[in-house]
């Protein structure tokens, strides 16, 4: 199974280097799947592969967990790409803004 999630935002040429730095930093933080830049369109993507050999089929629980992981990871780091592409922030600032955790309740 190969799943690709496209972030429908084109990376301007003047932000490409910083987006590549961000992609490397994010990939160092995650264990499953990876972010990449779709070279034809210059768009950030998240890619996930699941190798199933010998006719194996994932259970509903496994597939739902896979989709939840993909969704959670994309939702967590999509703002980082926005901070860099449109906000003009550097990769370090963007990561800090995306991985903070809140304390307490409102």
Language model segments and positions:
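Short, internal acidic amphipathic alpha-helical interface segments
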Residues: 6-43
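Alpha-helix initiation and N-capping motif
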Residues: 16, 78, 91-92
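Short, highly charged C-terminal tails/helix-capping segments
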Residues: 82-106
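N-terminal accessory segment detector
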Residues: 1-4, 10-11, 106
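Charged, low-complexity intrinsically disordered regions
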Residues: 35-88
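Surface-exposed beta-strand edges and their flanking turn/coil or helix-capping segments
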Residues: 4-6, 15-18, 50, 58-61
């Amino acid at each position: 199974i190969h799943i690709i999630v496209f972030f429908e935002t084109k990376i301007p040429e003047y932000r490409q280097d910083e987006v590549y730095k961000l992609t490397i930093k994010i990939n160092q933080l995650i264990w499953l799947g990876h972010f990449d830049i779709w070279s034809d369109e210059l768009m950030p993507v998240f890619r996930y592969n699941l190798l199933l050999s010998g006719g194996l089929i994932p259970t509903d629980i496994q597939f739902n967990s896979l989709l939840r992981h993909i969704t959670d990871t994309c939702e967590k780091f999509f703002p980082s790409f926005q901070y860099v592409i449109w906000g003009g922030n550097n990769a370090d600032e963007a990561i800090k803004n995306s991985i903070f955790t809140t304390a307490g309740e409102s």
